Amino acid sequence: MNKPIKTITVALAAIASMSVQQTEACTRATYIGPDNTVITGRTMDWKEDLMSNIYVFPRGMQRAGYNKGNTVNWTSKYGSVIAAGYDIGTCDGMNEKGLVASLLFLPESVYHRPGDNRPIMGISIWTQYVLDNFATVREAVDELKKESFRIDAPDLPNGAASTLHLAITDETGNTAVLEYIDGNLEIHEGKQYQVMTNSPKYE
């Protein structure tokens, strides 16, 4: 067995083993091999069926961050393959440039700022916005740190709060964790952020 295949096989086995452990939290992990192989995987430890479906989206799609009013509009630069949660929003995906995005639960999330009138971005399309527009983590961070929109996060179909945080990794293994805490976006970027779970927030 050659080295790249062996490395990928070992990493996939490790990720698979995480998914069968008895846990109460979703976990996302990125493996960076000695030959710069980058593999990202996650578990989905949720209390019910998320009714997920897989979708393939081409580049050139017209998008809106919200279904009415003051919102963000864009045309997708990159095609992507995604998994939808409750079949209404993008939870996980990878675009054609190798950018991977994963949305996980974070009870500490607070999106709201008093008197905030920035354009609205629905939590259900936030992940897709990143996949549509950015080829690398650095590109995404440079834009998202401007905080040019606010997140609207209605409750999930089962009544749970949509308190979520986002992790993105590019083909180099660079990763960013994005969390809304007290109405402000906190970004942690670097190859050292290889694991993300639910609570607590990053410090």
Spans of features found by a protein language model:
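Bacterial N-terminal signal peptides that target proteins for export
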Residues: 1-9
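Sec/Tat signal peptide C-region and signal peptidase I cleavage site
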Residues: 19-25
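Extended amphipathic alpha-helical segments with heptad-repeat/coiled-coil character used for oligomerization
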Residues: 157-203
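Bacterial N-terminal signal peptides
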Residues: 9-17
